[in-house]
Amino acid sequence: MITPLAPSTPSPVLTPIEARVLGTLMEKARTVPDSYPLTLNTLLLGCNQKSSREPLMELTEADVAAALNTLKEAHLVRESSGSRTTRFEHNFQRGIGVYEQAAVLLGLLMLRGPQTAGELRLNTERWYKFADISSVEGFLEELQDRSAEKGGPLVVKLARGPGTREQRWAHLLCGPVDATQTGLGRSSEGLPGNTAERLERLESELANLRETVQKLCAELGVSPPEQV
């Protein structure tokens, strides 16, 4: 396990593109370790992929290169040595000063936007296996209560949306977030009550199905399908 540093200055404020680049490096380090560190072209493809991304982006090579330069200056990304092709790897845990579990949650929030603790536990299956939702909530609360001496809070719990039972969490790596917003994104905000309830029930059933697929894949010794 990487031992994080404890920065005495506030965490750097990222642009959405920088957050996408950093989150993609963090994801690929865990999900495709044989291809990591990443070349610029592979990183670009990961940033623009259509699955497991919210919002979808259409970045150019110049966009990614500029973001990498800024992230290198902030000591959050570094170039990998020992290869004829320039490759890049993240230095998130040491640069921000968090442990692996917290880094996983922040990475998913950067890539997929606000999510409930249950959604985060499900979506992090390929990154890190949390024991239960309570453990996810525990790490999120630690990130929310992070002291100023360590760089300040890194997540915020958003207001509950209409027709929903659970609150969503958002990261603060791109600056302050209005905690009164629901953070529902593509979900049920603004829908009639019955429709919102049906959508929430379907989302819950989908989460259960995904968990069942994960277990079956583990028993069969095969890789789970890419989530969308």
Swiss-Prot record:
SUPFAM superfamilies: Winged helix' DNA-binding domain. It comes from the Bacteria. InterPro entries: DUF480 (IPR007432), WH-like_DNA-bd_sf (IPR036388), WH_DNA-bd_sf (IPR036390). Belongs to the UPF0502 family. This is UPF0502 protein Rfer_1648. It comes from Albidiferax ferrireducens (strain ATCC BAA-621 / DSM 15236 / T118). The lineage of its organism: Bacteria, Pseudomonadati, Pseudomonadota, Betaproteobacteria, Burkholderiales.
